[in-house]
Regions:
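Conserved N-terminal strand/loop that marks the beginning of ABC ATPase nucleotide-binding domains
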Residues: 42-49
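Sec/Tat signal peptide C-region and signal peptidase I cleavage site
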Residues: 16-19
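Conserved beta-strand scaffold positions in the cores of enzyme catalytic domains, especially
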Residues: 45, 84-88, 190
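Bacterial N-terminal signal peptides
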Residues: 4-14
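Metal-coordinating catalytic core of metallo-dependent amide/deamination hydrolases
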Residues: 21, 26, 30-35, 168-193
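Metal-associated gating/positioning segment near the N- to mid-region
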Residues: 92-158, 162-166
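Histidine-rich, glycine-flanked metal-binding segment
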Residues: 29, 36-38, 51, 55-95, ...
Length: 193
C-alpha cells in the first residue's frame, strides 16, 4: 500500500510540475514577437554640442559618435571615421531619447476619428484580456510628431475606461508597416490599472 501511495504521489508531482511549466510558458512566450530590425546607417559624429548624458553629466563643446543609430561614444574631440557624416551642433543641445511610459499613440490615432479609436474595451470594469498591441495603427501621424519632440520609445497602454484596462506594449518609435516592426525586442508587457 505504501508503495502505491508513493507512486501516486510521485506521479502527481511530475504532472503538476509539467502543468505549471506549461502555464508559465503560456504567459512568457510572445505569440506576436517583435520583427524590429535596426536600420543600417553609417557613422555620424555630432560635434560641438552641449551634451546631456542622462546620468546628470553635462558635456560642454561635446561630441557624440553614432554607429547604426546607436551612441558608441560621448566626449570631447572624438575622432570621426573617414566615412562619417559630421554635423556641427554649435549652440545646440543633444540629449538621450525620451521614453513615454504612458502613451495612447496608435490606439487613439490622429486625426481622431471613430474608426481609429481603439483604446478602450468599455464592456466591463475588468478587461485584462485586452492587448493594446492589437489596436496600434503604426501609421498614426502622432508617432512622427512625438519623434520630432525626441520621443524614441513608448509604452502604449489601453485607455482608462476600466479599473483594469488590459496589457500595454513597448514600442520603438520607428516607421513600420506593422506594430510588430515597432515592438521593442524583449521588453516586458505593462498592465493598465
Amino acid at each position: 500500500m505504501r508503495l502505491v501511495l508513493l507512486a501516486v504521489a510521485g506521479l502527481a508531482s511530475v504532472c503538476s510540475s509539467a502543468d505549471a511549466a506549461t502555464a508559465r510558458s503560456r504567459f512568457t512566450q510572445d505569440p506576436y514577437p517583435s520583427t524590429y530590425r535596426a536600420i543600417a546607417a553609417g557613422p555620424v559624429l555630432i560635434r560641438h554640442a552641449t551634451v546631456l548624458t542622462g546620468t546628470g553629466e553635462r558635456v560642454e563643446d561635446g561630441d557624440v559618435l553614432l554607429q547604426d543609430g546607436k551612441v558608441v561614444a560621448v566626449g570631447r574631440s572624438l575622432e570621426a571615421p573617414a566615412d562619417a557624416t559630421v554635423i556641427d551642433a554649435t549652440g545646440r543641445w543633444v540629449t538621450p531619447g525620451l521614453i513615454d511610459v504612458h502613451s495612447h499613440l496608435g490606439v487613439y490615432s490622429s486625426p481622431g476619428v471613430n474608426a481609429h479609436s481603439d483604446g478602450n474595451e468599455a464592456t466591463a470594469p475588468v478587461t485584462a484580456n485586452v492587448w493594446a498591441e492589437h489596436s496600434v495603427w503604426p501609421q498614426d501621424p502622432g508617432f512622427h510628431t512625438a519623434l520630432a519632440g525626441g520621443v524614441t520609445s513608448l509604452q502604449v497602454l489601453p485607455g482608462s475606461a476600466n479599473l483594469v484596462g488590459g496589457r500595454g506594449v513597448t514600442l520603438k518609435n520607428v516607421p513600420a508597416t506593422t506594430y510588430q516592426g515597432m515592438k521593442f525586442p524583449g521588453a516586458p508587457w505593462g498592465l493598465k490599472m
